[in-house]
Amino acid sequence: MISMLAGNGSSVTEFVLAGLTDRPELQLPLFYLFLIIYIITVVGNLGLIILIGLNPHLHTPMYYFLFNLSFIDLCYSSVFSPKMLINFVSEKNSISYAGCMTQLFLFLFFVISECYMLTSMAYDRYVAICNPLLYKVTMSPQICSVISFAAYGMGFAGSSAHTGCMLRLTFCNVNVINHYLCDILPLLQLSCTSTYVNEVVVLIVVGINITVPSFTILISYVFILANILNIKSTQGRAKAFSTCSSHIMAISLFFGSAAFMYLKYSSGSMEQGKISSVFYTNVGPMLNPLIYSLRNKDVKVALRKSLIKFREKTDFN
């Protein structure tokens, strides 16, 4: 919908989300596919949150950050997935201007927060493997809280900068977003005013939020690898590697798919960018609980104990 401004211009009051595809025969199959993905994402992340909360032996810095990671994945997939699913079976795929800006803010908030939460987890593994004697002091509950609040603070700062700059733009005439969610680059393509400031902000904010986490994670794992190679026992070396393997997989999935998506966008291939963004926005949050639970002995033991307790309660009743 487009309303007239005072003067010769017009302003968009709602957007239309183009979605993944405009082929009618694919809408229903895609609806069921992404519904299954979303259900697995919600059940997996919510289950991991509950499992960590209910088991005292998982109340450690490592699982504190994993708790926050699952919370972020649950929230940020819920920012756009319900609307995406509705659009598969709805004829009118519209979203209000306010709704679009809200979705943009929340999506960016949780995505940037995840960057720094993954970074916090890398630092936690560095301290645990390289400075085990100082681990309890270095990763005290107070310090863990400060680190997690800093991650959310960076998310808030980044999303506020992007959304604030987006609010200053005027959208007129064309209101079809070539995406299944309100994201920065597809929205910038619709602006009928200069996007120079936005592009500078994107360059600065994205640069910071890629460089700082990537550099910190890289340095952490360089020290971790050097320390592991100095471990003489094969069993100790294998244990150290297994401690980090799940986190390395999660990092590779998140940063790899995000980099691939934005490279496709920057090359001008919007359609390929949309497809690759599915791995970044949908597949990652679904796989993270599976990666951390299937490869983690403590989580599997906690799950087994919780299931036994639940079975005992149901049998008793």
UniProtKB/Swiss-Prot annotation:
Signal peptide: none
Listed transmembrane segments: 33-53, 60-80, 98-118, 137-157, 200-220, 243-263, 275-294
Major subcellular location class: membrane
GO molecular function, one term: olfactory receptor activity
GO terms, biological process: G protein-coupled receptor signaling pathway; sensory perception of smell
Topological domains annotated Cytoplasmic: 54-59, 119-136, 221-242, 295-317
Topology of the protein relative to the lipid bilayer: Multi-pass membrane protein
InterPro entries, per database record: GPCR_Rhodpsn (IPR000276), GPCR_Rhodpsn_7TM (IPR017452), Olfact_rcpt (IPR000725)
Topology, Extracellular side: 1-32, 81-97, 158-199, 264-274
UniProt cross-references to SUPFAM superfamilies, sorted A to Z: Family A G protein-coupled receptor-like
A GO term from the CC aspect: membrane
Residues of this chain annotated as glycosylated in UniProt: N8
Pfam families: 7tm_4
Record keywords: Cell membrane, G-protein coupled receptor, Glycoprotein, Membrane, Olfaction, Receptor, Sensory transduction, Transducer, Transmembrane, Transmembrane helix
Subcellular location: Cell membrane
Family membership noted in the UniProt record: Belongs to the G-protein coupled receptor 1 family.
Function: Odorant receptor.
Protein name: Olfactory receptor 8B3
